[in-house]
From Swiss-Prot:
Belongs to the D-alanine--D-alanine ligase family. This is D-alanine--D-alanine ligase. Mg(2+) 1 binds at residues 268, 282. Mg(2+) 2 binds at residues 282, 284. Cell wall formation. Keywords: ATP-binding, Cell shape, Cell wall biogenesis/degradation, Cytoplasm, Ligase, Magnesium, Manganese, Metal-binding, Nucleotide-binding, Peptidoglycan synthesis. HAMAP family: Dala_Dala_lig (MF_00047). Gene3D superfamilies: 3.40.50.20, ATP-grasp fold, A domain, ATP-grasp fold, B domain. The keyword ATP-binding applies.
Length: 321
């Protein structure tokens, strides 16, 4: 079994963190996805901020009985701190729409579209957003040779935090015939663009700023690099010419709007070294809130501290009727 996998959990774990407050917030964390640990780390700072803001807070580590538990708890708002399957992919927003409980972050369709790399790519290209060349490969295709000229990137369709992402360079001892499709029967094979990794934080439709990621150890921005201190430097704001920086913000707001996102999001790009051409990678509708996460860092640069960021996210809580 691979290290990061979705697993089924029958019962939710519920803890009261604060029993008094102006509104009752259910902080939804953990869950059953491969990104469970990231969600738990994100929830630590979020829970402290919610209590500091004067909310009544109930911590819920989500299991399959979540609908019953929500009926028992009766929160005013759900703060969706889940990452990955069941939380970020539209499942939880869909349930909360049915239950008519306001929730933070993007809605069901926006979350589902952004989480699925095939459908988000179709949506991006339909709206004239530039992306690298890619193809879909099915396990049943039984491809024995490289499906694309090296270097290329292998991406699972529905994983976040770069889980399962592999970059295959010309010199690598890699045989595609041996690839075991650990995260589903389809993958995206994407042209590798050599360039600068840029990330933009968007909050309630407004781009707050951009930063550049400088890799210090690994060859690409993988799970280990994202969540291990000392594996990457964040240059905030991104050291770009003013016109290019502004273009990056405008493009991010365009993606956010066309995907009908809500609350916080993080748009990811590669700036090709030779041509200065921007390539969109994805938009993350449930960005991390860990000490190493990008959205809180950019928000701080824009003058919004972590507690105020959480308050702004809460203000946009709603359900889709």
């Amino acid at each position: 079994m691979h290290k990061y996998q979705t697993h089924w959990v029958e019962h939710s774990i519920v803890k009261i963190l604060s029993s008094t407050g102006k509104k009752h917030i259910a902080l939804m964390v953990g869950g059953m996805s491969a990104e469970r640990e990231v969600s738990l780390v994100s929830s630590e700072g979020v829970s402290k901020a919610l209590i500091e803001l004067g909310y009544r807070v109930t911590f819920i580590d989500m299991g399959a009985d979540i609908a019953v538990r929500l009926q028992e708890i009766k929160p005013d708002i759900v703060f969706n701190c889940l990452h990955g399957t069941y939380g970020e992919d539209g499942c939880l927003p869909g349930l909360l729409n049915i239950m008519r409980i306001p929730y933070t972050h993007s809605g069901m369709l926006s979350s589902a579209l952004a989480f699925d790399k095939i459908h988000s790519r179709i949506w991006f290209l339909t709206n004239n957003i530039n992306m690298a060349e890619s193809i879909v490969v099915n396990k049943s295709d039984n491809i024995k040779n490289d499906p694309m000229k090296r270097p290329y990137v292998i991406k699972p369709l529905t994983q976040g935090s770069s889980i399962g992402v592999e970059v295959i360079f010309a010199e690598d001892d890699f045989n595609f015939a041996d690839y075991d499709f650990p995260y589903g029967d389809q993958v995206i094979i994407e042209q590798y663009i050599k360039g600068r990794e840029l990330q933009v934080a968007v909050l309630n439709g407004k781009a707050l700023g951009a930063l550049e990621i400088k890799l210090l150890k690994n060859r690409f921005y993988d799970y280990e690099t994202k969540y291990t201190e000392g594996f990457a430097d964040h240059l905030c704001p991104a050291p770009l010419p003013a016109n290019l920086y502004e273009k990056l913000l405008i493009e991010s707001e365009k993606i956010y709007k066309t995907m009908n996102c809500k609350g916080p999001a993080r748009a990811e790009f590669i700036l090709e070294e030779q041509t200065n051409k921007l390539y969109a990678l994805e938009i993350n509708t449930h960005p991390g809130m860990t000490p190493l996460s990008i959205v809180p860092e950019i928000a701080a640069y824009a003058g919004i501290n972590f507690t105020n960021l959480i308050e702004e996210i809460i203000k946009m809580a709603s359900f889709e009727s």
